[in-house]
Amino acid sequence: MAQGSPATVAACAFCGARRTRSGMVLSTSAADGYLDDEAQFETALRLLPAADQAAVRRRRAGRAVVLASRLLRTLGCAVHTGCAPALLAFDYSRAGKPYLRSRPAPAFSVSRSDCIAVIYVREGGAVGADLASVAECLSWAPDEILQLHDVFSAAELGRLRAAAPGRARAELFAYYWSLKEAYGKFRGTGLAGDLRLADMGELDPLRRGELRTLRRTLQGKHVCLSSRWHDAGHVLSLCEAREPSPTEEICLHKVPMEEVVRLCRPSLGMEKCHVR
């Protein structure tokens, strides 16, 4: 991993490649089988603080992806700050949004969908990230999406209604949903409040290989939302207040679960950080 201050070095903190975007996205999958091994699961779990271990154990379903998301949160912040993973201290706002108590403290946002976890981390200002699943939408009744009047504006529902039922509508829904939830995380409220106020308007489907940036004024605040396909079944959206340049790409690294665990071990040589 490349080290150095992400505020002054125009290189990805994870791979060292030059970049135009100041943040990075890491993702991992709990479906690769690594955490299916009980011994490996327990070894990975012990890398978390006791409170986080207890939170994972309380889960009746989806424990592996919850563990993956907590470890990825640690790894993303450790790589970005240069702090040793074991020295990072996290807390939660009243609304449940996690933040880093250690200093330096970048902005970050974590999302998980199906068996995949992602983190977006960068310097300066609030951020929101969301990963939305197409398969989850396909499991619903054909017209169930069109009944979500408390989620979508009239313009958004009209666009969803015009999409062909099935895969096409599910993909457009995933795009809209990822935008709304990324915006909610950016605000620190998640899905609380009137989601219709996060009106994205009439959108075309997100194309494969496309990086699309929207500029919106939502609830009196100017925001930029960037979206791309993470894989064939998930849309990734990021929300922030900054204005991206036309050439900026999302620096996305898909990290195998075994590598996430290895990099979160105490032996990882990074600098110390300060905790409030």
UniProtKB/Swiss-Prot annotation:
It catalyses: apo-[ACP] + CoA = holo-[ACP] + adenosine 3',5'-bisphosphate + H(+). GO terms for cellular component: cytosol. Its EC number is 2.7.8.7. SUPFAM superfamilies: 4'-phosphopantetheinyl transferase. It comes from the Eukaryota. It is an enzyme of class 2 (transferase). Pfam families: ACPS. GO terms for biological process: lysine biosynthetic process via aminoadipic acid. GO terms for molecular function: holo-[acyl-carrier-protein] synthase activity; magnesium ion binding. Keywords: Transferase. InterPro entries: 4-PPantetheinyl_Trfase_dom (IPR008278), 4-PPantetheinyl_Trfase_dom_sf (IPR037143), P-Pant_transferase_sf (IPR050559). Catalyzes the transfer of a 4'-phosphopantetheine moiety from coenzyme A to a serine residue of acceptor proteins, such as alpha-aminoadipate reductase. Necessary for alpha-aminoadipate reductase activity. PANTHER family: L-AMINOADIPATE-SEMIALDEHYDE DEHYDROGENASE-PHOSPHOPANTETHEINYL TRANSFERASE (PTHR12215:SF10), PHOSPHOPANTETHEINE TRANSFERASE (PTHR12215). Belongs to the P-Pant transferase superfamily. AcpS family. This is L-aminoadipate-semialdehyde dehydrogenase-phosphopantetheinyl transferase. It comes from Eremothecium gossypii (strain ATCC 10895 / CBS 109.51 / FGSC 9923 / NRRL Y-1056) (Yeast). The lineage of its organism: Eukaryota, Fungi, Dikarya, Ascomycota, Saccharomycotina.
